[in-house]
Amino acid sequence: MPAFASLLAASAAARVASLNLCTDEYLLLLAQPEQIVSLSYLSRDPLESPLWRQARHYPGNRGSIEDVLARHPTLVMTMGGVGGRSTALLAGRLHIQTLSLPYATDLDGVASNIQRVAAAVGHPEHAMPWLSRLRALQRSAVAHGVDAIWISGHGDTLAPESLGAQWMRLAGLRQRPLAGGKVTLETLLTTPPKILIKSDYRSGQMSGGARWLRHPIVRSAGTRQLITDGRPWTCLGPLMIPEIERLRRLPR
């Protein structure tokens, strides 16, 4: 068997644990179900992940390698160096491979992470449908989007060059620059955007952030309001692709 084919076969037999909500997303979308041995507890929460039904089929962990050792993983995935040197050292002693994905800062970074995870689990072909959909969105994106503001609890918003704003541009929306990364009630009252994108992340909770979004000025701002599923915006990974496709279909 050629060396590359042997490597793919070994990867396809991997037992994979994810210690992070964002790597949970990549793993659930790109691995075979039987390869997954543990996911972070957050992915099992309906308020945190659109994939919670799938995630509940697997044991949860609290984000440490010690939590998953009893599952005998051969590969442990984290993001942004979560767990640090201690995780890498322990994994090395136990002959467990680790894959630490970088936090993507642009759409190319998301595509790269998709490819890396698919290759790591021995199924590079699983990346292709997601990459094809992403490229289709990029090819068909308009040059100048509609003036828009993305908003979540407490008036938090996105920087105009952030990864979140790049996803918005694929939906034909141009994030307005705002001082301090905040939307004020005064802005919504005096210079509202053409479209207000409201995150529904934990919107049903009795929290200060949720109450801010229910303020009369926010609710009655003279602008078209679109509700977005706030959960994919936490990680800004491949689950943003179906959400952007959905936002495109909404009437403006």
Name every feature range the model reports, one short phrase each.
Residues 15-86, 176:
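A short, structured surface patch at a secondary-structure boundary
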Residues 42-47, 54-55, 158-183:
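Alpha-helical, coiled-coil/dimerization segments enriched in small aliphatic residues
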Residues 82-93, 198-213:
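A ligand-binding cleft/hinge motif common to bilobed small-molecule-binding domains
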Residues 20, 40, 80-81, 180, ...:
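Short secondary-structure boundary segments
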Residues 24-29, 44-49, 78, 151, ...:
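Short, solvent-exposed loop/turn elements at domain surfaces
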Residues 15, 75, 85-156, 177-179, ...:
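Extracytoplasmic substrate-binding proteins
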Residues 57-60, 64-78, 96, 184-201:
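Proline-aspartate-enriched helix->loop->beta-strand connector
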Residues 32, 54, 93-96, 171, ...:
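Short, structured coil segments at secondary-structure junctions
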